[in-house]
Structures are given as C-alpha cells and as structure tokens.
Amino acid sequence: MKRLAKRLQDFNELVMFQHSVFSLPFIFIAMIVASNGWFGFKLLILGVLAAISARNAAMGFNRYVDRVYDKENPRTAGRPSVDGRLDGGSIAIFTVVNALVFMAVAYFINDLAFYLSLPVLMVLLSYSYFKRFSSMAHIVLGISLGLAPMAGAIAVLGNVPLWSLLLSIGVVFWVAGFDLLYSLQDMEFDKTNGLHSIPSRFGSDITLKISALFHVLTVGFWGGFVFAAELGLFAIAAVIFAALMLSYEHYLVRRDFTQIDRAFFTVNGYLGFVFIGLIILDKVSL
C-alpha cells in the first residue's frame, strides 16, 4: 500500500497536478454560461475527467521527451522523470492511458467532442517540441489551455459561440503571458542548450513588455466575452479583478525575479477561482 501511495505521489509530482487550477475554472466558466447556470452532474464528472486526463497526457508526454534537457537543468533535475523514480516506460504508459481516457470521455460527452478529441490531443502534445525550433512555444502553450473554454461550450451546446471564442483567446494570452514570466528562470539555460524562447532570444526587458501586452489583450478579450455573453455586474467585476491580479503579478516579477514562482502559481490560481466564483454569482443574481 505504501509503495502504491509513493507511486501515485511520484506521478502527481510528474504532472504537477496542482497546476490544474489554471485550466479547470475556465472550462466550467464556459459550461456555466452555456447552460445559463447548472449543467448537471454528468457533465461535471465528464468535464473533470476530460480536463485532467488531457492535461496528464500532455504533461506526461512533455516530461518524457524533455528528459534529456531536464536532467541538465538545475531547476528540473529533481523531477521524477529524471532522478530515477519513474522510468521512461512507465511515463509512456501513463501518457497513452490518459490519452485514451480523454478520448473515451469525449465519446460520452457528444459526437463533436469525440471527433475533435484526437486533433486536440495533437495540439496538446505538439507543445513539447516547439522549443526545439521556435520561440512561439509560449503561444502554443496558451492555445493548448485556451482550448478549454471552447471545449466547455461544446460539451453543453455542441457548438462554439462567439463568447466562448473570446473567452478562449483571453486564456491563450493569459497563459502565454505568465509562461513568458515563468520562462525567465530558464533564460540562460535555453541559450546554452539551443532551446528557443522569447526570453532567450530577446532578453528579460522585452519579455516583460511582451508579457504585459499579452495580459492587456487578456483583459480586453475577457471584457469582450462578458459583453458577447450578455453577463452582468459580477462578471464585469471578475474582469476587473483579473486586471488587478495581472498587474500585481507583473509588479512582483519586475521587483524581484525570485518572486516568479509566487506570481506564477499563487496569483494565477486565485485569479481563476475568483473569476469562476464571480461568474457563478452573476448567474445566481439574474
């Protein structure tokens, strides 16, 4: 039993399950808006399973193909995929199983979700290779998580309304923006090892400016989402709160690069959960 618990702990550390807080709220924001309130326990369970299995597949694949780089990077050398706790075969099986679970769950959601499940997986897995040849990997990561709100709308409605597209584009720039900040930690390592990123190509000052621009766009697209979905004051408050949190994130990082982890996880985690809380209040108050 202890061995199983340790194994599960290692896989949890491998995929950093706690980082699911970035995508889960926005899937359910879309589902709440699409259903005009409550979308049912069936879709709740299927939505959670789809989000977690898709993310596990993407993270498992990333850890598998990046082992050679992670081993050399002091920041990542302690990962289970590198230090011997999990071998390549175990990680590969974990990735394949989660990919199959994702497709199976999509089948039980609706036809469109199932038909799109394989293309979505291809997008999620492609991120792992982009740093090898393009500085646009940050955008690809943003797109990977930005698919979540559209997926939520598809689960409920079977189509992609304009408001879900605006919400998704906002998530793309939100994620790409904070990934730029997070990547500042690996700027020198990427330069030395021939990996492509905006920080390694343009330096920290330009990276900070691009990240800030992305987050301005985030707020703009989320404002468009509120307008297109005809939401109320609580939803407007959610966008204002997001703007304040993103400003605070940039304040932390500009003041001290050692605050990047705090800015990355804590600030963005609060942003997602408060955002969905205010959207729920908006629907309840109508």
Where are these regions (language model features)?
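Membrane-embedded alpha-helical segments that form the functional core of polytopic membrane enzymes
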Residues: 25-65, 75, 99-107, 114-126, ...
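Small-residue-rich segments of transmembrane alpha-helices in multi-pass membrane proteins
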Residues: 24-30, 141-156, 201-204, 265-279
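Cytosolic, membrane-interface loops and tails of multi-pass inner-membrane proteins
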Residues: 1-9, 59-86, 180-205, 251-258
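Intramembrane alpha-helical segments
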Residues: 4-13, 49, 79-167, 245-255, ...
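Membrane-interface helix starts
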Residues: 16-24
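Extended hydrophobic alpha-helices typical of membrane-associated regions
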Residues: 4-6, 217-220, 224-286
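Multi-pass membrane catalytic core of lipid/isoprenoid biosynthesis enzymes
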Residues: 44-45, 49-51, 67-118, 192-233, ...
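Alpha-helical membrane-protein architecture signal
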Residues: 4, 8, 25, 45, ...
